[in-house]
């Protein structure tokens, strides 16, 4: 049995490597890949490798958002000599990188990002630079299952004869793998690129849904399209832009090779934080931003009726699109930028983990990869051998996540358990230990969605908005500001671009000088009044520069101890939940991150802090046991 397992692991590894080599060979000739290339990719790779030039004009930079885009930009700017302060509305860092760690077993589950394709060289280089170890993420295992229409087959059968699943494929489609059938439809896209050129072709693709293109342009039969939706999870993209589907497929295919971070993806944001100097303020939601002649002021909610103000030279906003819409800008954003912000289309994404007493899938010779089902769970990902028995029992996005909307955690876990048992038999019920974790990104108060996927641009200009251009002293970064959407490297690229522009003193654009003057005068309105005689609505606003921040009575202060560089909790007042303030000692660059996260633990569907100012923390999830409503 051990010899068989070893052969299966070796076969899966060779298959993944062969798929990667096939993809690399194809990508050098693939016009779609060439069309979607980043013109500045090699430059950004150099920035990750060598860093930015040391600045001769250090600026005070406030970075809003401690996801990977914000942390990467903060690291690069800090290394270049700028004074950086990071503000995060949540009670943790990482954004949509979110690793669950089961205290009982030590197993981990990725509630957010979990893989990176081999083509993402910038992200691979960043991980190596930070000393993070990578290992293979097994995307495909031929011994996994596909179950649709109550027919269940091993995936090595589906690859050769998908019609055995009950799809009435035509003669051209029979005997071809789902991936090959999808490639048949892309042949028309290749012809369009050659005939129209990259820009015109992508404009055309932006005006079609994936479903329209597959049926009308790709000339696939309806059963073949349904096969792709069920087996390749393309159904979630059917009514979205064909251009977006092309970008997604370039990074998401069973024929590509993927990596993951050994020990958990949250080691990436932790390593970034440890490598930069400056301050991090958690539980610090930004409510408004005011630009003046010579500075920009960032207003943070400290309670329901009071604010604190930070003054900086430049602000970098890396929060999600919905979070940005809750910020008041003075002067207001341009109409075009507001329209681009409202046009961002976030799709839901949900993950459900179940904890088992042992990895029963090994008995079926499954060492990783994913099974597919047309039941609500849709995709089931298996941990690699030696990675425990915490099963990603459901991964859904876009419309496929709808069956779980509104369900309680208990209902969700039981529904997913039934789906897993349909694939693997009653042993699933016997081995489940009654615990699980649910993460619905659409219900997260800070992201309010899984990732951006744009719908077709019917009757509108099909070109993507250029988020890299600053709005006065305000810059933007994040997964929504770059392509392809939905990947960690995209967020990294956006953070690098913003850091380069800020370091090069790119300049300030898009702001009407008269509006800037008006905003500056309004921001300084308080100065007309002696202390204690200010207008009531301004009473609670307090101004402080990043250099002079002091913890208020509502803050949880985290300081670096001189001896061990470990964070020591000071002034924690449980009944007054406020900011968590993390700062490094000027002489000693870097953070010790063991205690960055608050000590509160909650179920994913619970809350870490009361809903003051309309914000609920996404929390540090705890394993939920069915029937436990405490």
From Swiss-Prot:
The keyword Secreted applies. Induction: By interleukin-4. GO terms for biological process: adaptive immune response; aromatic amino acid metabolic process; L-phenylalanine catabolic process; L-tryptophan catabolic process; L-tryptophan catabolic process to indole-3-acetate; negative regulation of T cell activation; negative regulation of T cell mediated immune response to tumor cell; negative regulation of T cell proliferation. Pathway: Amino-acid degradation; L-tryptophan degradation via pyruvate pathway. Glycans are attached at residues 53, 133, 219. Substrate binds at residues 115, 395, 486-487. GO terms for molecular function: L-amino-acid oxidase activity; L-phenylalaine oxidase activity. Keywords: Adaptive immunity, Cytoplasmic vesicle, Disulfide bond, FAD, Flavoprotein, Glycoprotein, Immunity, Lysosome, Oxidoreductase, Secreted, Signal. It is found in: Secreted; Cytoplasmic vesicle, Secretory vesicle, Acrosome. Gene3D superfamilies: 3.90.660.10, FAD/NAD(P)-binding domain, Guanine Nucleotide Dissociation Inhibitor, domain 1. Its cofactor is FAD. Belongs to the flavin monoamine oxidase family. FIG1 subfamily. This is L-amino-acid oxidase. It comes from Mus musculus (Mouse).
């Amino acid at each position: 049995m051990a010899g068989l397992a070893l052969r299966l692991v070796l076969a899966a590894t060779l298959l993944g490597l062969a798929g990667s080599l096939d993809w690399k060979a194809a990508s050098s000739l693939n016009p779609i890949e060439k069309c979607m290339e980043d013109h500045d990719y090699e430059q950004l790779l150099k920035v990750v490798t060598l860093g930015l030039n040391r600045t001769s004009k250090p600026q005070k930079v406030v970075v809003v958002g401690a996801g990977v885009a914000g942390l990467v930009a903060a690291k690069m700017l800090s290394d270049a000599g700028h004074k950086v302060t990071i503000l995060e509305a949540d009670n943790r860092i990482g954004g949509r990188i979110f690793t669950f760690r089961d205290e009982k077993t030590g197993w981990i589950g990725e509630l957010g990002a979990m893989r990176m394709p081999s083509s993402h060289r910038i992200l691979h280089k960043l991980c190596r630079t930070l000393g993070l170890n990578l290992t293979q993420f097994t995307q495909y295992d031929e011994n996994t299952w596909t179950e649709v229409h109550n027919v269940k087959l091993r995936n090595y059968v589906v690859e050769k004869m998908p019609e055995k699943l009950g799809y009435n494929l035509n003669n051209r489609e029979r005997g071809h793998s789902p991936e090959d059938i999808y490639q048949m439809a892309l042949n028309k896209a290749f012809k369009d690129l050659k005939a129209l050129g990259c820009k015109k072709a992508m404009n055309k693709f932006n005006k079609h849904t994936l479903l329209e293109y597959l049926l009308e342009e790709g000339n696939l039969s309806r059963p073949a399209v349904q096969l792709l939706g069920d087996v390749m999870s393309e159904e979630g993209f059917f009514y979205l832009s064909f251009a977006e589907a092309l970008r997604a497929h370039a990074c998401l295919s069973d024929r590509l090779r993927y990596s993951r971070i050994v020990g958990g993806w949250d080691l990436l944001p932790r390593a970034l934080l440890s490598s930069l100097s400056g301050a991090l303020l958690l539980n610090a939601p930004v409510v408004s931003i005011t630009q003046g002649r010579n500075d920009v002021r960032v207003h943070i909610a400290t309670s329901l009726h009071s604010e604190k103000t930070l003054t900086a030279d430049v602000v970098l906003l890396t929060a999600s699109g919905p979070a940005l819409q809750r910020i008041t800008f003075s002067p207001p954003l341009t109409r075009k930028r507001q329209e681009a912000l409202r046009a961002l289309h976030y799709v839901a994404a949900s993950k459900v983990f179940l904890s088992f007493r042992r990895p029963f899938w090994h008995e079926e010779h499954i060492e990783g990869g994913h099974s597919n089902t047309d039941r609500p769970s849709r995709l089931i990902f298996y941990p690699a051998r030696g990675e425990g028995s915490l099963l990603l029992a459901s991964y859904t996005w876009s419309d496929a996540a709808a069956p779980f909307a509104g369900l309680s955690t208990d209902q969700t876990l039981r529904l997913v358990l039934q789906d897993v048992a349909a694939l693997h038999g009653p042993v699933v019920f016997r081995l489940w230990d009654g615990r699980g974790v649910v993460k619905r990104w659409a219900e997260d108060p800070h992201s309010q969605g899984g990732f951006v996927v744009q719908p077709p641009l019917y009757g509108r200009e099909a070109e993507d908005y250029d988020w890299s251009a600053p709005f006065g002293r305000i810059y933007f970064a994040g997964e929504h500001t770059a392509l392809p959407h939905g990947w960690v490297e995209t967020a990294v690229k956006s953070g690098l671009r913003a850091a380069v522009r800020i370091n090069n003193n790119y300049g300030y654009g898009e702001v009407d000088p008269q509006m800037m003057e008006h905003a500056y005068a309004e921001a300084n309105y308080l100065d007309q009044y002696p202390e204690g005689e200010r207008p009531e609505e301004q009473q609670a606003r307090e101004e402080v520069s990043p250099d002079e921040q002091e913890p208020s009575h509502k803050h949880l202060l985290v300081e670096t101890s001189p001896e061990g560089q470990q964070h020591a909790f000071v002034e924690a007042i449980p009944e007054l939940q406020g900011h968590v303030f993390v700062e490094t000692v000027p002489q000693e660059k870097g953070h010790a991150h063991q205690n960055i996260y608050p000590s509160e633990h909650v179920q994913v569907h619970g809350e870490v802090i009361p809903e003051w100012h309309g914000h609920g923390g996404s929390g540090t999830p705890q394993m939920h046991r069915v029937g436990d409503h405490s």
